[in-house]
């Protein structure tokens, strides 16, 4: 069982995140002025380092605050879908067979799934529903698929980086996918993505089965 995030640890994490955020703010201000190519290249390097610092804090927070308990993954997915529908989203759910109980933090897992659905809604056309599929094999698999423009193969590794927005018009924060992956990693699971240009994108959460 992973320990709950307490006030002391939270204070440390807040302190840790201030440095990279301050660096990003300073770089943004500097970029408003006239800078040459070499200076801008150095700024890009510093932004990358600062974002990696934020990523480490996000992962630390996600893992440190996880509380495991036996849950029904099908009910959790249905609850998340119901919440999305209430908010006006078009979501289609398919559950294949019976899903076994797993050990997970229901709050954090809902957060991860909510982030994936929100991402799919942003990038998919308004008239096309987001498709969610849940099934069990060697793990419990939960997939979220949109009918958006897709992601180029060369960009797939970047989408889990903090602050990355492949669509410059997106209103997202750039934190949803990194946080979702950190939460799933904290469950000893995996979050993977497959995509085809002009065909859409699928994110798949794989969660380990309970030990017998």
Predicted regions and their residues:
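Conserved DHp (HisKA) dimerization/phosphotransfer helix of two-component histidine kinases, i.e.
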Residues: 41-70, 75-87
